[in-house]
Amino acid sequence: DMTADILIAPTRVGGDWWDGGQYMEQCMHSWKPNSYSVENCWTYCTEGLTTVNSVYNIIEKSEAMSDELKLQYLSELRGLRAFWYYVIVDIFGNAPLVTDFEDTSLPSITSRADLYKYVVKELTEIIPNLRSDVSDASYGKFTQGAARMVLAKMYLNAEEWIGEPNWKGVVEQCDEIMKLEYIIEPNWKTNFEVHNEVSREIIFPICYKASDAWGNSIHLWTLHYLDPDVLGFTGGMWNGINAQPDFVRTFDTEDPRYEGSFLIGPMIDPSTGEILKTTLGHDLIHTIDLNVVPGTEKTDADGNLTPWGEVHQEDGARINKWVYEKGMQNTNMENDIAIFRLADVYLMKAEALVRMGRDLGEATRLVNAIRERAYGNSDHNYTSVTLDDIYNERGYELAFEFVRRQDMIRFGTYLKPRYMKPKQTPEYRKIFPIPFKAWQKNNNLVQNPGYPAF
């Protein structure tokens, strides 16, 4: 989402968060095969796959469990592997297909189209073997709901990824998910509470505990150093990530999701009733805008002056979607993060119906169900929903939930100039390059089109 229109990690006065310009690169779409963010993303994906293949290898050889239980576990692992390849298809397009942990040969590249077919085939095969219940026992596991959600995402983006739209497939998978026992939680914030494992809207979460060595650390990334004094906990914040101003301004300020997503305004010292002061003596007021200090503008790799410059500590709307637990003491957060939830299913089905020009009444009903839950009434309902309405609603409902870049590509807005990104981006940057370090380890890899060949 740092490459989309939703998040930004601005450089602060004094150079904090410059970090070699990696965040400017992400915002301006100027990343390279040796960029840290590209390497980091590739590493997360490949290490995730290696872990899955390793555990699969152990369980496959095990004689200590019943055939039925082994089939379930192996199916869940195949689902997790397919999930990681779904992420790779989205972000990198082309990558090696590796499923055998004991095969030490250097794999060749597999095309995006073939990886797409692999993911669809794997998920289709394992669904009958996965559990379908929506319960405490199934929470956090790769269930039928999770598998169908990945399939729906594959079909939703099929036109972009393989050149063949499959809107009908989106509707079919969404309908199957809605037959399961998931619900649209009456209270939107239930999905983001400290103990949001009670939500029956969440389909596939990242599960966190405060004791995790590297758990949910959103508070560290986004909050100012003094924000915990106001929010009622302790910890060393990093004062990094903000919401992009133009994205914040797309929200209706009367929409509860506005305050439910962003921390904006003065931070009041609870002991004095006064606005806190930063170390530079400024009032700690989180503004929507990021005001670049004149004379601090940075140059790009070609030596051209950019609009990117240093901003003050207090500038920027902070992420406020996941509830900050009062009383936390230098720990990570307990809140799980939903990779998939039912609200997204409603919006995906609505989008597919509108794109097919079919059953606009049902599409409108689905979007209005999400809006009514947010506002608490039907006063803000649509009479006939459009694709633009759905695009905007996805932003309001799913902000910071890992969908914005994908949505922008699908709706044709990703490459356009926007905040801190003055130029149109070339088409090839819809996917990221294969990292140079990955090629150094495996010379069979081939660079994605548009990027410098290895």
Placement of each model-derived feature along the sequence:
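C-terminal substrate/ligand-recognition segments
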Residues: I264, I268-N368
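Acidic, glycine-rich segments characteristic of secretory precursors and extracytoplasmic regions
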Residues: D1-G15, E39, S54, L97, ...
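Conserved, well-structured interaction surfaces
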Residues: W17-F92, L106-D114, L123-A137, A317, ...
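Short coil/turn linking the two alpha-helices of tandem helical-hairpin repeats
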Residues: V87-P96, V134, N157-E164, R355-R358
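An aromatic- and glycine-enriched ligand-binding surface/loop that stacks and positions planar moieties
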Residues: D1-G21, L123-I127, K141-E297
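Long, intrinsically disordered, low-complexity segments
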Residues: W17, C45-G48, R112, Y118, ...
